[in-house]
């Protein structure tokens, strides 16, 4: 259900704004999106796993907060994030 360290490093590398960037909103949204996709796939075979579903809702809420922050700061970056990670608004 969680992502591997190698996959996380790859996601960070592809979404970093500069080298060594691990905390920008873009990177955080990318990591959360990866975890959300993994959990969504998990629920296809474990539909009654309500404990993990609660964690999924928390991840979605955190990602929504980060996206709201990016939208407030820079609308173009926000739209690029939505398009890049196929996030519905």
From Swiss-Prot:
Q: Name one GO biological process term.
A: translation
Cellular component per GO?
Answer: cytosolic small ribosomal subunit
Q: Does the keyword Cell division apply?
A: no
Q: Which GO terms describe its molecular function?
A: rRNA binding; structural constituent of ribosome
Keyword vocabulary terms for this entry = Ribonucleoprotein, Ribosomal protein, RNA-binding, rRNA-binding
Q: Where is this region: Disordered?
A: 1-25
Subunit composition and interactions: Part of the 30S ribosomal subunit. Forms a bridge to the 50S subunit in the 70S ribosome, contacting the 23S rRNA.
Homology family: Belongs to the universal ribosomal protein uS15 family.
Descriptive protein name: Small ribosomal subunit protein uS15
